[in-house]
Amino acid sequence: MTDMPTLDAIRQAPKALLHDHLDGGLRPETVLDIAGQVGYDGLPSTDAGELASWFRTQSHSGSLERYLEPFSHTVAVMQTPEALYRVAYECVEDLAADAVVYAEIRFAPELHINRGLTFDEIVDAVLAGFAAGERACAGAGCPIKVRLLVTAMRHAAMSREIAELAIRFRDKGVVGFDIAGAEAGYPPSRHLDAFEYMRDNNARFTIHAGEAFGLPSIHEAIAFCGADRLGHGVRIVDDIEVGLDGDVKLGRLAAILRDKRIPLELCPSSNVQTGAVASIAEHPFDLLARSRFRVTVNTDNRLMSDTSMSQEMYRLVETFGYGWSDIQRFTINAMKSAFIAFDERLEIIDEVIKPRFAVLIG
C-alpha cells in the first residue's frame, strides 16, 4: 500500500477518539423516530436527508454561539431513559463501523432533566447503552471500548454537582469531567470548585478552551484549573510566531503547553464551522503537529459536521499530505492521552493499534 492513504484505506485503520459529543452525533433517522415517539414537533423537516442537510447547514454558522443552536433539537429527543440508551448504543455502533477502537464520548446530564430524570438515571441509561453496544460490536467482530465524560455547561451553576456525579460513576464507565458551552464571558475559573473537587479525588478532566476565545481561556484552563487536556485549544496559535524563513518561535504559554505534553483535542471540520479558522488549509493543525505538540484528531459533532473520524483524517491527508506514519502518530497521541489506566492504554496501543497499522503500512 502506498504512503498516501485513501479514504477507503483510512476507514480500515484503527482510531482513537477523545472529543465527541453524544448529542451532536445522532442519526437523523433516530432524531425523527424518537421525535415521533415523544411528541416533539419542533423539527425543521420530517425527511431524514433534509434534516441531515439542515443540521450541517445551520452548524456552518461562523460563530460558536450560533453553532450550538441546532442542539436544541437533538437534546429535545434525549429526555427519556429509552432514548438515551438508544442514542448511546447507536453511537457505539457507528464508531465501531468506522474502525474506532477507543472513544471517550461526552455529554451534559443537566440538559436531559426536562422530563424529570435524575442525573444518576441519565448516566445509567447512557452507560447501559454503551455497554450493550460494546457487546454487540464485539460479537460482530469489531471490538471497541467506549467511556464517558460528564460535562457541565459553563454558563450554568451545576459544575460542582456534575463533578460529584463523575466521581460517583468513576468505576462504572465515567472516566472524566469537562466544561463546555459558549466561552466568551464564561471563563473556566468560574468553576474552580469543581476542578478542585476532581483533583482532590485524583480524577481527570478536560476543558473546552481556546475554541472561540483566545489565549486567556487557555491560560486559565492550564494555570488556574489544572486541565489534563484542552478541548480544541486551537487559539494557541496566537502565541506562536512563524518567521519569513519558516522558523517557529513559541510564546511562553505555547511553550509550556508543548513542554508539559498537554493534549490538544483538535476538531478540524468543527473549527471551520464555528469560524475558529477559515478553512482546513488555514487550520494550525499542521503547524502544531510539526512543532511536536500533542495533537489529536477528533470529530466534535458527527451529525452537525456530517463527518466521521475517517473523514477528518482524510481531510488532513488531502490538505497537508500526511502519510500512514503521521496518522499512526496522531492515533497513538490520542490513545496516550486517554483517561483510562496506563496499562489499558498500552494494551490497546501495542495489541491493536500498532499491529493493524503495520498491516496497512506493509
UniProtKB/Swiss-Prot annotation:
Keyword Zinc attached: yes
Electron transport: is it a keyword of this entry? no
Cofactors needed by this protein, per the record, are: Zn(2+)
- UniProt keyword list: Hydrolase, Metal-binding, Nucleotide metabolism, Zinc
Known function: Catalyzes the hydrolytic deamination of adenosine and 2-deoxyadenosine.
| Family listed | Belongs to the metallo-dependent hydrolases superfamily. Adenosine and AMP deaminases family. Adenosine deaminase subfamily.
Which HAMAP family does the entry link to? Answer: A_deaminase
Tell me what this protein is called.
Adenosine deaminase
What organism is the protein native to?
Answer: Mycobacterium ulcerans (strain Agy99)
